[in-house]
Regions:
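Long, terminal "pre-/pro-" and other extracytoplasmic accessory regions
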Residues: 2-243, 248-272, 276, 285-301
Length: 301
């Protein structure tokens, strides 16, 4: 009996020792990952500060998506050409577009705030549209613009959706119209993501958007994550923290996984995590930690 007790005691000591030896390594791994994420966030804040300085300190109007839009759907007989042609920037003018500058116009956000900005000519807007090709299409026929009028369009910005002045271009052979925000493309901050490194890819959870509380002291990040919480196999819970500067905020989202082994699906779901700020968000921009790009922020309902 004593022998059995001694064996059991030795086994228990070995188990405890094994668990103890794993603990520091696991803790160190998490600490290293946290330090890496904070370093990545600091680098994103530094790149944003440089971009704002290059833009003359302006970060009121920061689009978070392209400034080219489309009104209507392509007809069946032209869609196979026109959609890739637009993505390739193959748009030319079939008539002389005005190159004179229209009067200043107003950007209006959904929260009621406004900003008066200088606008660009129709000819310049078309040049800007062509200068942003997404993919080449050597076999496509160019779209031909046969008219332009100053209108408005909705654009996603770092402060949420905004209605902005826009040139609306009519096209030959289709009822579809193109829109281009009538504000110079280079007037706001333009930040480039860090170069891709296959041996050291960016860490963290990519943020799609965020909502803020009325007092601006909390940000809720919206992102794609595990469908279930950590109480289920393959599930994850998420926490968030904010790394702040005078110009921007980076949200770090940390996943807390269920360690139970099992087969997991690749299906994602919309998840959220909330971070508290040291001071109200104000006019600061919220950045994604993966690439340091601005994300749209709206007032929480």
């Amino acid at each position: 009996m004593d022998r059995h007790r001694r064996i059991g005691a030795v086994a228990m000591v070995l188990i405890v020792a094994a668990l103890a030896s794993c603990g520091p390594f696991e803790f160190a791994g998490r600490a290293n990952e946290t330090a890496r994420l904070h370093e990545q966030a600091d680098a994103a804040l530094a790149r944003w500060a440089a971009a704002v300085a290059a833009a003359g300190g302006q970060q009121d109007f920061v689009p978070t998506e392209g400034m080219t839009g489309q009104v209507g759907d392509w007809e069946v007989d032209v869609g196979d050409n026109n959609k890739p042609a637009l993505m390739a920037g193959l748009v030319e003018s079939a008539t002389q577009l005005p190159d004179d500058l229209p009067p200043k116009a107003e950007i209006r956000w959904n929260d009621g705030t406004t900003k008066t900005v200088p606008t660009i000519s129709a000819a310049q807007a078309l040049r800007d549209l062509r200068d942003e090709p997404e993919s080449p299409c050597p076999e496509c026929h160019p779209l031909r613009v046969n008219g332009a009028r100053l209108s408005t369009a909705t654009v996603q910005t770092s402060r949420g959706p905004a209605t902005a002045p826009a040139w609306e271009f009519s096209l030959a052979g289709t009822h579809v119209k193109l829109t281009r925000i009538a504000i110079a493309a280079g007037d706001g901050p333009a930040v480039q993501p860090p170069p891709w490194d296959a041996n050291n890819p960016s860490a963290g959870v990519r943020i799609d958007s965020a909502t803020r509380t009325a007092d601006g002291r909390q940000l809720t990040a919206w992102f794609t994550g595990a469908p279930d919480g950590a109480e289920k196999p393959c599930g994850e819970d998420y926490t968030a923290e904010a790394v702040e500067s005078d110009l921007a905020v980076v949200i770090i989202v940390t996943a807390h996984s269920n360690p139970t082994p099992g087969g997991c699906t690749l299906v994602g779901a919309v998840r959220t995590a909330t971070a508290a700020l040291a001071r109200p968000l104000g006019d600061r921009t919220v950045l994604d930690i993966m690439e340091g790009r601005p994300v749209p922020v709206q007032l929480a309902p």
